[in-house]
């Protein structure tokens, strides 16, 4: 029983982590909408979720030689397989950010994040109800 509960929470924990990382990527795309030569990137959420749930995690240890280097919270970004967003709307300056697509994906990602939070909240509420009798 506890193993099943752990699996449910692990799934949603991984989904929340990936949603958070995707939100950072989408935010970077939106922030760089006017940056000449910027190439919009994303990752396949379903593939990355399956990879984190069903395969052994590979840990990358980075050596910090300066306090200005990336901190620990960014290390998981290196494990994601980011891909360039294919678009037929390339600006004259080489920028490939499509703001309509980015806004829609940002909204969809936010909905996934909120859905996982609501599911976790309801599961905890149900467990508390059962335990109280």
Curated annotation (Swiss-Prot):
Pfam families: Flg_bb_rod. One of its GO terms (biological process) is bacterial-type flagellum-dependent cell motility. InterPro entries: Flag_bb_rod_N, Flagellar_basal_body_rod_CS, FlgB. It comes from the Bacteria. It is found in: Bacterial flagellum basal body. The keyword Ligase does not apply. Keywords: Bacterial flagellum. GO terms for cellular component: bacterial-type flagellum basal body, rod. Belongs to the flagella basal body rod proteins family. Structural component of flagellum, the bacterial motility apparatus. Part of the rod structure of flagellar basal body. The basal body constitutes a major portion of the flagellar organelle and consists of a number of rings mounted on a central rod. In Gram-negative bacteria, at least four rings, L, P, S and M are present, whereas Gram-positive bacteria lack the L and P rings. The rod consists of about 26 subunits of FlgG in the distal portion, and FlgB, FlgC and FlgF build up the proximal portion of the rod with about 6 subunits each. This is Flagellar basal body rod protein FlgB. It comes from Buchnera aphidicola subsp. Acyrthosiphon pisum (strain APS). The lineage of its organism: Bacteria, Pseudomonadati, Pseudomonadota, Gammaproteobacteria, Enterobacterales. The gene is flgB.
């Amino acid at each position: 029983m506890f193993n099943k509960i752990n699996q449910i929470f692990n799934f949603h924990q991984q989904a929340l982590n990936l949603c958070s990382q995707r939100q950072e990527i989408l935010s970077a795309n939106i922030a760089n909408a006017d940056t000449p030569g910027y190439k919009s990137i994303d990752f396949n959420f379903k593939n990355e979720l399956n990879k984190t749930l069903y395969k052994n995690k590979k840990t990358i240890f980075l050596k910090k030689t300066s306090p200005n280097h990336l901190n620990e919270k960014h290390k998981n970004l290196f494990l994601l397989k980011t891909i360039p967003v294919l678009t037929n709307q390339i600006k004259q300056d080489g920028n490939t950010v499509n703001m309509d697509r980015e806004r829609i994906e940002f909204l969809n990602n936010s909905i996934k994040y909120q859905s996982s939070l609501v599911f976790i909240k309801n599961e905890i509420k149900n467990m508390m109800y059962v335990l109280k009798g």
